[in-house]
Amino acid sequence: MVLAFGARVSTKDVDAIFQPTQVVRDVARQVGESLGFEIGWLNDAAKGFVSSRHETTNAALPQFDHLRLTAPTPEYLLAMKCMASRIGVVSADADDVRDIVFLIRHLKLGSAKEVMDLVAVYYPANRIPIKAQYLVEGLYAEGRI
């Protein structure tokens, strides 16, 4: 959200899919220790939300000889965020909610149905959690979109 969309100034961690997994984790731990980052600053939790229709882009992302950066397309990222639907206890805008609102606005989706239809493009209907539908419907009902 920070690098690919400029949606906010900073993030507490970097979500990535990387290989070789253990080698990258070991190096990330060493880098984190030397820079004073929290444990888990680089994580691969996003791999649990990878769709068989895995759509990425490298547009506007820096590229290096030794590192290839890609990001999910906005549509795919919105679907992933809806699948996760992590809602913070402390703040109404915690976790995925702020990102979901940003992406819905970015994509100019006019209704909760449009959002959920988009999610269904990437994930089978029987895998989409009902909390995602309730969250998205609530955002529209509250006028946050």
Q: Where does each model-flagged region fall?
A:
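Compositionally biased terminal segments of proteins
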Residues: 1-145
